[in-house]
């Protein structure tokens, strides 16, 4: 029998002991909708746990009574461990499931380059109660609780050297090497930098990372030939598109992360292609600026556009990927079509100047 997939989705807006957030719960709800959608993550709702601020209404006025706290998140991991025990008893191996999605949106911190924590609702400046999201992902991966581990964290990663991340309570274990395990981690900010939430085109406040992430997962990060949403394409999509949602002021702020931190980006399919899936062969505008028209070659050195007529600039529509613009005299310019979208969700024109 095939192993099940799991998902933990956490979004915390209310921090009585810190600055409140406006978009973390909305981010979590949107991710939960995607991860339980049969056309998205396809995780059975009985294996998906969503924990958000409004679950604990009326909200506490002080940090002492604020929720969710670490116990609420750790209850999910207890369920995971029980699933692994059931599978072992049924002689299905020691894994709890095939894949797990871990999504966290809220305040966060990073005491060092290799550690990252998400603050719980009862956190204060002098009592940073937290969950070690990255450490949990590492423990589930290293111990073979899942074959595939995906971690998405939309939270700041400011350095607090005096604070430490709360480690997992699972004991380390050495799993069999087969089947080979894979993982993919993406953080909204690089270590030491801030993440941003802001009103987007629809007027709703959202994390710019989560908004970009879900665009990619909803077939924006499709591998054109296969129709699959892959980790490779999602990495490119996140690194190319998140900064498009930042304002000019935010782009100039040295404390704000312009691109996400993507690590352990093992190659695998996140969402398998489906016949007729939208945007599988999506094309994006390219503007060519040169003295004379040339031709465009793809990564396999095949001509994909030529015979441009009329005065410059010339235009073309291309799928995501790497290309060469070759001029009649032999000059060559490399360029990439990323599929980036602007704040109104319209494709950004790739300009190629020679």
Language model regions located:
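Caspase-like (clan CD) cysteine peptidase catalytic core
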Residues: 66-166
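A short, solvent-exposed beta-strand micro-motif common in secreted/extracellular proteins
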Residues: 320-331
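Caspase-like cysteine protease fold
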Residues: 7, 95, 222-302
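Functional beta-strand-loop-alpha-helix junction segments that form "active/interaction loops"
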Residues: 28, 33-97
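Short glycine-rich His-centered loop
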Residues: 1-20
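Structured interaction patches on ligand/partner-binding surfaces of diverse proteins
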Residues: 260-263, 330-354
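Active-site-proximal C-terminal subdomain of hydrolase catalytic domains
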Residues: 11, 22, 28, 35, ...
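Short, acidic Ser/Thr/Gly-rich low-complexity loop/linker segments typical of extracellular
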Residues: 300-312
């Amino acid at each position: 029998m095939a192993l099940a997939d799991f998902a933990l989705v956490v979004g915390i807006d209310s921090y009585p002991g810190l600055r409140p957030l406006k978009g973390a719960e909305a981010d979590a709800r949107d991710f939960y909708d995607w991860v339980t959608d049969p056309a998205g993550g396809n995780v059975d709702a009985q294996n998906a746990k969503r924990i958000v601020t409004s679950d604990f209404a009326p909200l506490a006025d002080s940090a002492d009574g604020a929720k969710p706290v670490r116990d609420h998140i750790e209850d999910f991991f207890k369920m995971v461990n029980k699933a692994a025990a059931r599978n072992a008893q049924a002689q299905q191996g020691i894994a709890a499931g095939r894949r797990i999605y871990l999504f966290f949106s809220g305040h966060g911190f990073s005491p060092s380059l290799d550690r990252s924590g998400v603050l719980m609702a009862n956190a204060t400046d002098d009592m940073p109660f937290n969950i070690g999201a990255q450490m949990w992902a590492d423990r589930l991966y290293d111990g073979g609780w899942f074959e595939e581990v995906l971690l998405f964290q939309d939270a700041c990663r400011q350095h607090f050297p005096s604070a430490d991340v709360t480690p997992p309570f699972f004991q380390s274990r050495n799993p069999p090497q087969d089947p080979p395990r894979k993982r993919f981690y993406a953080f909204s900010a690089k270590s030491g930098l801030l993440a941003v939430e802001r009103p987007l085109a629809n007027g709703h406040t959202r994390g710019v990372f989560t908004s970009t992430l879900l665009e990619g997962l909803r077939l924006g990060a499709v591998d054109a030939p296969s129709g699959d949403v892959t980790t490779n394409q999602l990495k490119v999509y996140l690194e190319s598109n998140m900064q498009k949602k930042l304002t000019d002021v935010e782009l100039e702020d040295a404390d704000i992360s312009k691109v996400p931190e993507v690590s352990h980006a093992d190659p695998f399919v996140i969402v398998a292609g489906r016949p007729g899936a939208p945007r599988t062969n999506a094309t994006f505008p390219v503007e060519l600026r040169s003295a004379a028209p040339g031709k465009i070659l793809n990564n396999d050195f095949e001509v994909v556009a030529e015979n441009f007529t009329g005065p410059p600039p010339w235009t073309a529509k291309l799928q995501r990927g790497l290309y060469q613009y070759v001029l009649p005299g032999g000059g060559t310019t490399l360029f990439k079509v990323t599929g980036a979208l602007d704040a109104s969700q319209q494709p950004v024109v790739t300009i190629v100047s020679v």
